[in-house]
C-alpha cells in the first residue's frame, strides 16, 4: 500500500452553468444532509434570479464534497442530480480511475480520515474552507485497485442497509404527521370545529435565549438553533459550551417541557420547533425562543402543530427576510393562530408519538451499528 497526494487520485471538475430556460433546482450546502439531498431545503431558480453562489454545474459520475471546515457533506452525482445547480461551497471531483476506484473515492471523501485532514488544511479569515492548495497537502494511503473494489463493494452494501434504515425513519415521521392530521385536521380550515386561539393565549412565559458567545471549556452546555432539526427533534450530537453569570441563568436556561422555537435562520428553517425532553440544565442561545405553555395545551402538541406542513408554509410566508437570514420575533410568534382540541385528545396523540419514537430508537440503534462498522473498515485501510 503506497501513499499519494489526494489530487493524484482525483481531478477537480465542474463548471459554471450555461444559460437555461425556465427553472432549475438549486442545491445549497445546507440542502445536503450528509450524503443525500433534502429537497425541502432546495430552491427553484431561474438563470437570472439565482443566488450568486448557485454557480456550479456538474456531470453524472462527479462527486461533491463541502469545502467548509467542520462540515461533512458528500454527494454522488447520478443522472437526475446532474440536472441541478449547486453551491460554489462544494468542490466537484472525479476519480483518476488508473489509481482510485470511483466508488471508493466517494467513501473516502465522506470518511473521518479525509475530513480530519481537510479541516487541518483549511484556511480563511472568517469561514475556513479547503482550497486547491490545501488539497495538495492531503496525503492518503492507496491500496491496489482490486483491493479497492472489494472494499468499495462492502461499503456500498453497508450504505444500502443504512439507506433502508433512514427510509424507515422517514416513514415513522410521516406516520406521526398523518396521525396528527387524522386526529385534529388542518389549520386554519379547522374541519373538526375546535376552539381557536393564538399562541399568546396559551403561554405562561416567553423569553429569548442568551446572546453571549460560546467559549471553549465553558461551564454550561449551550443549546443552539442547529440543535433543533427541521423535523422537530432535539439533536445534541454537536453542542458548545458557555460561561454565564448565575443571576442570568433563570432567564435563559431550559427545563423539561419547554417548547423551543428557532426565530432566526435561513428563510426555510425559521420556525423549527422542538420540545426539550432532557433533565440536564442547558443555556439557550439567543436565536431560539423559550416558550412555557399553560395547561390548555401540551408542549408536544404545540411543537407538532408548528412542524406540520401547513404551519411550515405559514411560517415561510410570515418571516421577514434580511441579508442571509430571516426572522420571526417573539411577538409575531405569539400572534400565530392555533386550534385547541381537548387535552385528552392531545394526550392520545402524544402517546402515539412516544410509541413511534420507541420504534425509531431501535432503527437508529441499528443505523449507529452500521456506521461503526463502516468507520472500522475505513480505519483499517486508510487510518
Predicted regions, residues:
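A short beta-sheet element
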Residues: 54-56, 60-110, 250-307, 329-330
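Non-catalytic DNA-recognition/assembly elements of restriction-modification systems
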Residues: 1-19, 137-153, 164-208, 335, ...
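Sequence-specific dsDNA recognition surfaces
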Residues: 7-19, 27-63, 197-212, 226-258
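A generic structural signal for short beta-strands and their flanking turns/coil linkers
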Residues: 23, 87-89, 219-221, 238, ...
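A short glycine-rich beta-alpha junction/loop motif
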Residues: 68, 83-91, 123-146, 281-288, ...
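Short coil/turn segments at secondary-structure boundaries
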Residues: 19-26, 120-122, 192-195, 212-219, ...
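Short, solvent-exposed loop/turn positions at domain surfaces
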Residues: 52, 79, 163, 209, ...
